[in-house]
Amino acid sequence: MALEALTDLKKVRNIGIMAHIDAGKTTTTERILFYTGINRKVGETHDGASTMDWMEQEKERGITITSAATTCFWKDNQINIIDTPGHVDFTIEVERSLRVLDGAVAVFDAKEGVEPQSEQVWRQATKYDVPRICFVNKMDKLGADFYYTVQTIVDRLGAKPLVMALPIGAEDDFDGIVDLLNMRAVTWRGKVEIGAEATYEEIPEDLKDKAEEYREKLVETVAESDEELMERYFAGEEITVDELKAQIRKLTISSEVYPVYCGSAYKNKGIQPMLDAVIDFLPNPMDVGSIKGHDAKDPEVEVLRKPSKDEPFSALAFKVAVHPFFGKLTYVRVYSGSVETGGQVMNSTKEKKERIGKLFQMHSNKEQPVDRASAGHIYAFIGLKDTTTGDTLCDAQDPVILESMDFPDPVIEVAIEPKTKSDQEKLGTAIQKLAEEDPTFTVKLDEETGQTVLGGMGELHLDVMVDRMKREFKVEANIGNPQVAYRETIRKPVEKLEYTHKKQTGGSGQFARVIIALEPYEPEEGSDQTYEFVNEVTGGRVPKEYIPSVDAGIQDAMQYGYLAGFPLVNIKATLLDGAYHEVDSSEMAFKLAGSQALKEAVAKAKPVLLEPLMAVEVITPEEYMGDVIGDINSRRGQVSSMDDRAGAKVVKAKVPLSEMFGYIGDLRSRTAGRANFSMIFDSYGEVPTNVASDIIAERTGGNA
C-alpha cells in the first residue's frame, strides 16, 4: 500500500537527529521508529543491525556515514527524520541535511556533555537557523550527570537551555523523569521491554524541592518573554500548561530557548516525552514560511515560494545515493507545489529537463512508493539523470533557483593506482558515481606523476570511499599514503600587470591583450568562496563576450600555483583594461591571456604556502598533561586553552594536519592509553618559511 503524505502541513515535522559520534543518535532514532510503529524489531548499533545505518561500512564501524531519511507517525502527526553522521569527516552530510530541515533534536551524552563535534554541528544548525530541542541521552551510563551536561550547553554553546524534565535517579538507578510542565513523574522502572508504556506517578519526595525550583525557573523564563504573561506572573496568577506550551513553542521556533529532555534510548526510557516535544515545540513547514530563491533568468530578482500545493513546484535536491536495485536515488525536499510520478520538471541550476520515473518516501533503505510529491515533505526521486546535490528542481513554466550550498575543499589526498586495465575502467565509473553522491569527495590528475589523486575531509572519509570502490564497484587498486592538501596564496597586491597573447602563423592569428590587478581576497566568515573576479573595463576595449574567457583563464591558472603547483586561493583579480583585434581575437586567445597574466602577476605578489590547521581537543588525566602539551608544541601546535572536565584535563590547540598523522598511537603510548582526542578542520594558515622550503623542494624535485 502506498504511504500518502499528510496534506495538513501543520501536522508535519521535518527534523534531523544530530550529535557527537558516540552520543547515541542512531539508537535514539531506532527507538523513535519503534515507538512510532515503523520497526517491529529494534536494531542495535553495536550488533550491526541498525535500520538507519544501511551501508556495509556503517554496519561494520558502528557509525552513521550517510543521512538516511525516514518517515514515521506520532499522535496523528507525520515526522520525516534524517539521521546524520557524528564523525567530523562527514560534516557535509550534516550540512546538507540541515539545509532542508525545519527543526532538529540535538543528542548529548550525559557523561561527556557538549563534545567537539556537538559544537561543530550546533554551529552548522545555527548557520541555517534550525530550531532545536535537546535530548540528554545515556542517563543510565556510569558517570551520567544531567546538570553538568545542561551547564556545558550554556558554557560551550552559548545557548539558553530550558530544562523541561529532571532525571529520577542516574546510572543503573535511572528510572524516569519529572515532567516539569505537568509536575508529575513519568517512570519506566526496572528492565524495560521495548515498547513499554510509561507510568505516571507523584513526584518522589526527595525530588519535590528541586522540581519546584526548576518549575519556577521554567515559568519565569517563559513569562519574561511576553508582557501579558509577565504581568500575570508577577501578580501571582497561574499560567496554564497550554499557555506555557504555546509560548515555549514560539521561543523555540525563534531559537531563543532550547527545551531540554533526558533519557536512555538504549534502555527505552524517555523517548515518548521527547517525541511529544518534537510535535509540541518544533516548527512545521507553515511556521517556517516561504523559501527564498531568485529568478532563474535574473539573480537580482528575489522570488518567494510558499509551502502550498497551489504554488508552482519548487524543490531542492540535497543528497544523491546509489541504490542496489533502482540505481541513482535523489533525495529532495519539496518546498512548494507538487509533482506526480512520471511528471517532468526543470533542473533550473543546470537548465535541463528531468523526468521522474518513480517517487518514494524512504524508510532508511526501504522504499514506500507514492503517487505524488507535495510541498513540505522529503522524498526520494528515481530517474533523474543530471541532478546533483544542491540543484533546484522546479516548474518549467515558472523557473526559480533556490539558495544552494557551499562545499569545503578537501584537506587530505591519496594517490590511487588501478592494478589492471579493467580496474582502470571500473575506477572511472566508481569515481563518477561516488563524486555525484558526495561533493566533498574530489578527483584530479597529478600532471607531474600522472597519478589519479582522490581528495576528502579526513582519513576515515577516504577510507570509506576506497572501501566502497572495492565492495560496490569491484575496483582493485594500490593506495598511496595520505597527503596534505596544501594551498598557495599571495600576500602583496600587484597594481598593474599587462600581458599580450600574440601568435601569427599562416591564416588567421591569435591576439588578446589584458591588464589585470591582483590582491589578497578575504572571504566572508562561513563562506567557502576563495576567489573574486571584477571587470572594470570601459568603452568596449575588451568586448563583453570575451570577459568570461579572461575570468575562466585566470581560474584555470589558479589550479596550479607558482611555488609548488598547489591550487591558488583567496585571490581577487580585477580586469582593468585590454585590447582586441577584429579578426585575430577569440575566446581562446583571451582565456590564454588571462591565464598567463595571472601566472606572471602571482610571481610578483609574494606567493606563500598555506596548510590546513586542525582544531584539536585532547582529554587526558592530569599526570600526563605536561607530556601532552610538550608533544603538541613539538608538532608546531599552538595551545589555546586548558580546562577541567569530569576529573580530567582538556587541552585545546590548533595543529597543522601534516603533523597529526599517527597521532593517536603516540598519544596512547605517552598516556598509557588513558587519553583520547578529536580533531576538526579549522582553517588554512601560512606555512613557516623553513618548513615551506622543504615541501616545495620535495614537490619540485629539489628546485626550491
Swiss-Prot record:
Belongs to the TRAFAC class translation factor GTPase superfamily. Classic translation factor GTPase family. EF-G/EF-2 subfamily. Keywords: Cytoplasm, Elongation factor, GTP-binding, Nucleotide-binding, Protein biosynthesis. GTP binds at residues 19-26, 83-87, 137-140. It comes from the Bacteria. Residues 10-286 form the tr-type G domain. Its main location: cytoplasm. GO terms for biological process: ribosome disassembly. It is found in: Cytoplasm. It comes from Corynebacterium jeikeium (strain K411). This is Elongation factor G. One of its GO terms (molecular function) is translation elongation factor activity. HAMAP family: EF_G_EF_2_B. The keyword Transcription does not apply. Catalyzes the GTP-dependent ribosomal translocation step during translation elongation. During this step, the ribosome changes from the pre-translocational (PRE) to the post-translocational (POST) state as the newly formed A-site-bound peptidyl-tRNA and P-site-bound deacylated tRNA move to the P and E sites, respectively. Catalyzes the coordinated movement of the two tRNA molecules, the mRNA and conformational changes in the ribosome.
